Amino acid sequence: MKIRIGFGYDVHPLVMNYNLWLGGIKIPYEKGLKGHSDADVLIHALCDALLGAADIGNIGTNFPNTNKKLRNIDSKILLKQTMSFIYSKNYELNNADITVCIEQPKLNPFIPQMKTCLAEIMQTDKGNISIKATTSEKMGFIGREEGIAVFATVLITPINEIGISCQ
């Protein structure tokens, strides 16, 4: 087996009367993300990157929005299932690098909690997860606060037969 890299992207509309879930935590804000699930765009991009790295489809093929059982599902459940898929292919996360494109709210105060949440689900050290936030300088749908986009890159590495990470 080889070391593999994956790239994920997701975007959701930012609207009134919805909760804002990012990185598995609820962010206090006047708007939230709209989607089939809880619309945690960060976790969705991360799942897409992991699934792509392992060559097992994408978030849409593994968790289709046509599946009524997934309606309003907590995206942390999707990430946990994605990690099960990764482990079944004999891989584990080496590291994840995530960029959230968002005008408001400012995310820096929430990033440590997001990293803790994701590390617990992914059974990895918080130091293996990087989360950064950037604005679009008031340009486009992100700048107008109509949506949030997230880019995620992951590196997954083989696990040897006794379950110890290959280093």
From Swiss-Prot:
PROSITE patterns: ISPF. It comes from the Bacteria. GO terms for molecular function: 2-C-methyl-D-erythritol 2,4-cyclodiphosphate synthase activity; metal ion binding. One of its GO terms (biological process) is isopentenyl diphosphate biosynthetic process, methylerythritol 4-phosphate pathway. Binds 1 divalent metal cation per subunit. The record marks 36, 135 as: Transition state stabilizer. 4-CDP-2-C-methyl-D-erythritol 2-phosphate binds at residues 10-12, 36-37, 58-60, 63-67, 134-137, 141, 144. Keywords: Isoprene biosynthesis, Lyase, Metal-binding. Pfam families: YgbB. Its EC number is 4.6.1.12. Its cofactor is a divalent metal cation. A divalent metal cation binds at residues 10, 12, 44. Involved in the biosynthesis of isopentenyl diphosphate (IPP) and dimethylallyl diphosphate (DMAPP), two major building blocks of isoprenoid compounds. Catalyzes the conversion of 4-diphosphocytidyl-2-C-methyl-D-erythritol 2-phosphate (CDP-ME2P) to 2-C-methyl-D-erythritol 2,4-cyclodiphosphate (ME-CPP) with a corresponding release of cytidine 5-monophosphate (CMP). Belongs to the IspF family. NCBIfam families: ispF (TIGR00151). This is 2-C-methyl-D-erythritol 2,4-cyclodiphosphate synthase. The gene is ispF.
